[in-house]
């Protein structure tokens, strides 16, 4: 197997300086948003004055908040690491669909095997946590009650995993994880982007696949469930708004789980290396920043957000419509890709929605051997799945109202991520497909919203 250590100037995310800024800045931002939620009624905390003394007091106050409310206790380590270990055991032992990844050029076109059983892991975890809750062994409200300490543990664990994976790859290569791949030569940038493409322990425990669904989306869902249970214990009922975030996070976790085999041939799996960017975001960023809608509802009396029936119903309709487009659009794209590569697998996992699979799809057969889908949802907009995904995220914030900016962090951040991702996708598609991509844009002229943009 040939080595692919190629030293080149870092380009994405501002190179090493940008990577370092993200690696230090985002954990700080997470703590700041959490402190605003817990200690300042979900409003931004500001310095008393824009002087040296004012900023000193500002940072001293934040440090105190973190110490008293987010200290990484031994129990928090036990809870978080136990959750990860149990998920790893399920990953290796529960039944699922076996499939293969895309041919990897740096591994002589080898196609790695994958066992896709996240859907079994999801519902098994629900049953286990339900039993532990009713037997008082482990209250599911722990996920929301210990939000701060668990967030700290997730952040620490993400940094540790990044360091171990980066150094292990450089020192031991595929004897431990995987061979170094597309290195820039700058250790900060390479740790951020990743030193290897497909790190594994053994033949089936693929770290990238493991962190893709089970850690971020499962924990996010259980944070919301914990909030719902705590609200029921406090008020004797669960508000429609808290039920909404539970539904939204359930739909997303379930969608990622039931379509796990469709993740295998995606760009993330076949090209994106596994470093701090993916490790931190999946382990800490997703569950502990996308949940600010839940934190707001949890920390306020339901009377504060007792919206009109019309408003609440409208947000429910928005969520369900966007979810339908999101689910079926991604299903169409990935089923088509699997058909092309001969890895098509039909599963009956819930929910099976109409128009999930396109019969007799139309597509462009490109000069480089690739294909570009021109039917289904993509006939109307080339990135319509991003549009649906964004409006789902926006609905999670809209259900909280407009009294706090914190729930809107996720949709605002996600919008920036999507714009960056789309610009990167277009640039790479133009380079990869050339004139065929121009023809694709002619047939499918709209990017996000049909007949508008």
Swiss-Prot record:
Key word Transmembrane present: yes
Topology class, membrane: Multi-pass membrane protein
Keywords attached to this entry: Endoplasmic reticulum, Lipid biosynthesis, Lipid metabolism, Membrane, NADP, Oxidoreductase, Steroid biosynthesis, Steroid metabolism, Sterol biosynthesis, Sterol metabolism, Transmembrane, Transmembrane helix
Organism superkingdom: Eukaryota
Pathway the protein takes part in: Steroid metabolism; ergosterol biosynthesis
GO cellular component: endoplasmic reticulum membrane
TM annotation in the entry: 13-33, 77-97, 118-138, 153-173, 209-229, 278-298, 311-331, 399-419
The reaction(s) this protein catalyses: ergosterol + NADP(+) = ergosta-5,7,22,24(28)-tetraen-3beta-ol + NADPH + H(+)
Annotated residues for binding of NADP(+): 333, 337, 373, 385-386, 425, 429-433, 440
Recorded GO MF terms: Delta24(24-1) sterol reductase activity
BP GO terms, sorted: ergosterol biosynthetic process
UniProt keyword Endoplasmic reticulum, yes or no: yes
Disulphide bond pairs: none
Disrupted gene: phenotype observed: Abolishes the production of ergosterol and accumulates ergosta-5,7,22,24(28)-tetraenol. Leads to susceptibility to cycloheximide and to staurosporine, but does not affect tolerance to nystatin and to amphotericin B. Leads to cold-sensitivity, a supersensitivity to divalent cations and several unrelated drugs including staurosporine, caffeine, chloramphenicol, sorbitol, and SDS. Does not lead to a sensitivity to nystatin, amphotericin B, thiabendazole or hydroxyurea.
PROSITE patterns: STEROL_REDUCT_1, STEROL_REDUCT_2
EC number, UniProt record: 1.3.1.71
Annotated localization: Endoplasmic reticulum membrane
Coiled-coil annotated spans: none
Family named by the database record: Belongs to the ERG4/ERG24 family.
Note: In Aspergillus, the biosynthesis pathway of the sterol precursors leading to the prevalent sterol ergosterol differs from yeast. The ringsystem of lanosterol in S.cerevisiae is firstly demethylised in three enzymatic steps leading to the intermediate zymosterol and secondly a methyl group is added to zymosterol by the sterol 24-C-methyltransferase to form fecosterol. In Aspergillus, lanosterol is firstly transmethylated by the sterol 24-C-methyltransferase leading to the intermediate eburicol and secondly demethylated in three steps to form fecosterol.
Task of the protein: Erg4 catalyzes the last step of ergosterol biosynthesis by converting ergosta-5,7,22,24(28)-tetraen-3beta-ol into ergosterol. The third module or late pathway involves the ergosterol synthesis itself through consecutive reactions that mainly occur in the endoplasmic reticulum (ER) membrane. Firstly, the squalene synthase erg9 catalyzes the condensation of 2 farnesyl pyrophosphate moieties to form squalene, which is the precursor of all steroids.
Name this polypeptide is given: Delta(24(24(1)))-sterol reductase
Annotated gene: sts1
């Amino acid at each position: 197997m040939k080595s692919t250590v190629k030293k080149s100037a870092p380009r994405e995310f501002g190179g090493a300086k940008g990577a370092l800024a993200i690696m230090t800045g985002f954990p700080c931002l997470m703590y700041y948003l959490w402190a605003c939620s817990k200690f300042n009624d979900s409003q931004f905390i500001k310095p008393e004055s824009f002087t040296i003394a004012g900023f000193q007091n500002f940072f001293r106050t934040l440090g105190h908040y973190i110490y008293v409310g987010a200290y990484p206790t031994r129990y928090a380590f036990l809870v978080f690491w136990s959750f990860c270990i149990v998920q790893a055991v399920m990953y290796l032992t529960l039944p699922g669909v076996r499939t293969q990844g895309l041919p990897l050029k740096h591994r002589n076109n080898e196609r790695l095997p994958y066992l896709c059983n996240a859907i079994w892991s999801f519902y098994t975890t629900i049953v286990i946590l339900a039993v532990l809750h009713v037997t008082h062994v482990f209250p599911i409200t722990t996920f929301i009650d210990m939000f701060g300490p668990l967030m700290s543990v997730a952040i620490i664990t993400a940094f540790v995993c990044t360091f171990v994976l980066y150094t292990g790859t450089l020192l031991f290569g595929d004897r431990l994880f995987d061979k170094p791949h597309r290195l820039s030569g700058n250790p900060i940038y390479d740790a951020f982007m990743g030193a290897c493409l497909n790190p594994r322990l053994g033949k089936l425990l693929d770290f990238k696949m493991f962190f893709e669904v089970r850690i971020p989306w499962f924990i996010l869902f259980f944070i919301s469930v914990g909030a719902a249970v705590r609200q029921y214990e406090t008020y004797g009922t669960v508000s429609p708004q808290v039920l909404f975030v539970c539904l939204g996070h359930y739909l997303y976790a379930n969608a990622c789980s039931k379509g796990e085999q469709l993740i295998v041939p995606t760009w993330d799996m076949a090209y994106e290396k596994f470093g701090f960017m993916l490790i931190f975001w999946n382990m800490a960023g997703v569950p502990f920043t996308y949940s600010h809608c839940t934190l707001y509802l949890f920390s306020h009396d339901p009377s504060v957000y007792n919206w009109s029936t019309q408003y609440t119903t409208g947000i429910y309709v928005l969520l369900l419509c966007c979810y339908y487009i999101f689910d079926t659009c991604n299903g169409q794209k990935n089923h088509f890709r699997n058909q092309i590569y001969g890895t098509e697998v039909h599963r009956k996992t819930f929910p099976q929605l109409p128009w999930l699979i396109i019969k007799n799809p139309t597509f462009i057969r490109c000069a480089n051997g690739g294909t570009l889908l021109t039917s289904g949802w993509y006939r109307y907009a080339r990135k319509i799945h991003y549009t649906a995904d964004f409006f789902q995220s926006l609905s999670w914030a809209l259900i909280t109202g407009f009294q706090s900016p914190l729930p809107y962090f996720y949709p605002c951040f996600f919008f920036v991520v999507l714009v960056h991702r789309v610009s990167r996708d277009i640039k790479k598609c133009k380079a990869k497909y050339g004139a065929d991509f121009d023809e694709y844009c002619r047939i499918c002229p709209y990017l996000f919203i049909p007949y508008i943009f």
